[in-house]
């Protein structure tokens, strides 16, 4: 791997816990071990680079991890392990990505542009071009939740390409909409390519991939099956899909179950050890390989799972909050409660004898 990349992904994995219900998720929070919770690895050690000015296509079957990878690169979701280095501002285009359903199209344009770092005067200058490119008519003033998927794609694409990002990530955004808008999008992408923009293009349409992409990465059930010249990788992917379609219904289900089982059984520790051994073989004199690999795996990752220290702290804060509420409702002071904690649950009741006091003047 050279140093001319715009995007560098190294040893990236993504793990999800497969909770069957919210109750099971809550129980796991208080459990001493999460070994009983099934895990699913959407990505299992992806390493690749995207060069400056290159258009890289991502292909693969449904559920292979293409969108997961594009979301990690764009910073929408974090990776479980590995490093992601992006040299420049990214803008992702996916159906409805980043659009707020309760806001109008016009309000979403301003919000997304502000989030990309544009000022209000800059947005005002671009507004007519964005509106014209999206071409959604009076729906511009309606809440986005009333839009069709094609209209959401139009609006999202128009916003993304007009904020002038360094890196454009397009995730199935051209799969909806009419031919006229599709051609406008292709022309805009071609214009970006001519300007030397870096593009990651996710699509199920191999024709789109062949037209737009310089290289292609085939993501296959969480792994990088192949990366290389568009013609070569697309040819191999077509051979795979032809083979798969030729299987019986039973054989297809068996193949898919086996692939999903591999993703559930993936061992991150074994993968880490494999990387260590490969590096040691390449450089036997390096005594710090294990530490370097650990840093590559976890050095830039913020854990999505709570440590036990944080769990205990959260529980303690929750208990203190509940006690504070009970003290407030009971009407007693903190000192009274500390002397007689039972007052919180069974507050003392003082009975007054109205007959005894009625004659006092």
UniProtKB/Swiss-Prot annotation:
Keyword presence, ATP-binding: yes
Sites where the protein binds ATP: 60-67
One GO CC term on file: plasma membrane
CDD domains documented for this protein: ABC_KpsT_Wzt
Membrane topology of the entry: Peripheral membrane protein
Listed Gene3D superfamilies: P-loop containing nucleotide triphosphate hydrolases
Function comment: Part of the ABC transporter complex TagGH involved in teichoic acids export. Responsible for energy coupling to the transport system.
SUBUNIT field: The complex is composed of two ATP-binding proteins (TagH) and two transmembrane proteins (TagG).
Protein name: Teichoic acids export ATP-binding protein TagH
Species of the source: Levilactobacillus brevis (strain ATCC 367 / BCRC 12310 / CIP 105137 / JCM 1170 / LMG 11437 / NCIMB 947 / NCTC 947)
Gene designation per UniProt: tagH
